[in-house]
Amino acid sequence: MSFQVPTVGVEEEYQLVDPRSGALIPNCKEVMRTIRRNGGSEEAHSEIQHELHLNQIEMASDVCSSLEEVRDALTQTRRMLIDAARSNETELASAGTNPLPIPTDDALTPKDRYQAMTDRYQQIARDLFIFGCHVHVAMEDRELGIQVMNRCRRWLPILQAITANSPYWDGVDTGYASYRRELWAQWPMAGPPAHFDSLADYQSCVDDLVACGAIKDESFLYWDIRLPTRVPTIEFRAADVMTRVEETVGYVGMIRAIVMLAISEEEQGKPIVPIRPSVLSYAIWHAARYGMNEQLVDPESREMIPASELLNRLMTAIDPALKATGEARPVEAFANQLIKSGTGADRQRRGGELSSVVANVVAETVPSAILA
């Protein structure tokens, strides 16, 4: 196999929390005002953005040519955000949900798109206090992008399991490793993408969704893997935001290698193993429910296997691509940590009282936290 190493980018959505109680607080305007006053985010190699609610804030990295650049962007941006948040009596927390009772008086970000979403989707939009991690991999050719998307669907269950970081919701243990997934699944355009025969087939689907009023335009597709309209990339959206920088770095490297593998398989004409949509949907739900703590469904073989074995199948498949990047070590460290000590959801459940859980997440959000 021969590989080209594509550029990548990453987005992380963070919680803004009260330093005493750990509860979400709507201080995004104040934090962004402080960042602008201090000269903006250019030196952090990222863009800082609003999200749906004012207790959320998002970073989007510049285009990165290496995992070292990803690490630098995440580290510098988190430090900048933490400093700006603390100057406004706020802490930054990186996890898929906040464990404490959800806000009853949270302010919506004043943006036409967000207001339209809330007007249409009502309570599921008002309750959308969830925080994800999105990875972009360069993809100039959208026809190729469709086939890569088809080939990457098989990995969605294990990607869901390894990034699970949201066991608590509204003050209770939900029983899920990723309850964020279940909250997000309520949205009609969320979930795994279908298999598309071609770019024309994909575009026909988009046209049908617009025609029937399901979406305003293509940018309202929120599938777990999608082709964004603004940038020439393929975007992976299934993950909870992870707490430690090194987890995100390893995950970005994993996604890049998955895309490289899919491109190589497409160029070789390797047949795609058909996956039934119902099997894939169940496999993803099962991964969100149990994380790495139970057996998972391999959607290609339709067999239930240990989670560690499904992760091993992924690592074996992408090994040639990882070696081609020269940056296998962060990905291998991430995989080893998952086997040794579990996911972010597992760490949260070992954290004791919910206020202590938030405090631990806040502490690990600081870029100095290392894998252990």
UniProtKB/Swiss-Prot annotation:
What does the record give as the reaction this protein catalyses? L-cysteine + L-glutamate + ATP = gamma-L-glutamyl-L-cysteine + ADP + phosphate + H(+)
Q: State the EC number(s).
A: 6.3.2.2
Q: Which Pfam families match?
A: GCS2
GO BP terms: namely: modified amino acid biosynthetic process
The protein's superkingdom reads Bacteria
- Nucleotide-binding among keywords: yes
What molecular function does GO assign, one term? Answer: ligase activity, forming carbon-nitrogen bonds
Q: What class of enzyme is it?
A: ligase
Q: Which UniProt keywords apply?
A: ATP-binding, Ligase, Nucleotide-binding
Q: What does this protein do?
A: ATP-dependent carboxylate-amine ligase which exhibits weak glutamate--cysteine ligase activity.
* Family, per entry: Belongs to the glutamate--cysteine ligase type 2 family. YbdK subfamily.
User: What name goes with this protein?
Assistant: Putative glutamate--cysteine ligase 2
This protein's species is Rhodopirellula baltica (strain DSM 10527 / NCIMB 13988 / SH1)
